[in-house]
């Protein structure tokens, strides 16, 4: 056990926080849930219609599925369904299941576009775009989201806040 070498996290979260270290998965999972809630508040506070304020569940093939983000953009009237992910590096079976969920939930909602939203990356790296686009799935980052909602902050302020305010709190928690 002494010789086990911890692996560096592949989550974009650490990059967004300006940290380069090993991570505690439970802290990252909780962070992911909280940042999802944050972006739903941003959408609700914008001119776009947040379609999950009352209910974030939809029935798909007899099962209840959680909706991370669903909104009608005030700029283009497009109905978006977004699955929030801070990490796009999951195994091939999970990729297939997650991609399938996006398609099924998008169809159940009658959304125009179903995609991943990575709330800890400004723009999605080309390798990830290619990987997911080749499977017929779009992936968006913060810069894209801020182009669709009239947030009360700009991208630089968001990432500065993550690094300077959120990161020290998570470090104190053990990240």
Q: Where are the model-predicted features located?
A:
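Interdomain/boundary linker segments immediately adjacent to catalytic/signaling cores
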Residues: 1-47
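An acidic- and aromatic-residue-enriched active-site/binding cleft used to recognize and process polar
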Residues: 56, 85-87, 120
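Active-site beta-strand-loop-beta-strand hairpin of nuclease catalytic cores
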Residues: 64-82
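Hydrophobic beta-strand segments of well-ordered beta-sheets in folded domains
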Residues: 78-81, 110-121
């Amino acid at each position: 056990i002494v010789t086990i070498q911890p692996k560096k996290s592949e989550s974009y979260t650490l990059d967004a926080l300006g940290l380069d270290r090993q991570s505690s998965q439970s802290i990252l999972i909780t962070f992911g849930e909280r940042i999802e809630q944050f972006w739903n508040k941003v959408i609700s506070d914008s001119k776009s219609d947040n379609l999950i304020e009352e209910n974030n569940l939809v029935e798909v093939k007899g099962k209840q599925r959680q909706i991370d983000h669903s909104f009608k953009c005030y700029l283009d009237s497009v109905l978006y369904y977004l699955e929030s992910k801070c990490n796009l590096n999951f195994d091939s079976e999970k990729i297939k299941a997650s991609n399938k969920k996006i398609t099924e939930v998008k169809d159940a909602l009658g959304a125009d576009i179903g995609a991943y939203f990575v709330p800890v990356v400004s723009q999605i790296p080309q390798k990830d775009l290619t990987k997911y686009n080749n499977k017929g799935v779009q992936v968006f980052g913060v810069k894209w989201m801020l182009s669709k909602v009239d947030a009360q902050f700009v991208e630089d302020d968001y990432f500065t806040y993550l690094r300077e305010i959120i990161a020290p709190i998570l470090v104190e928690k053990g990240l």
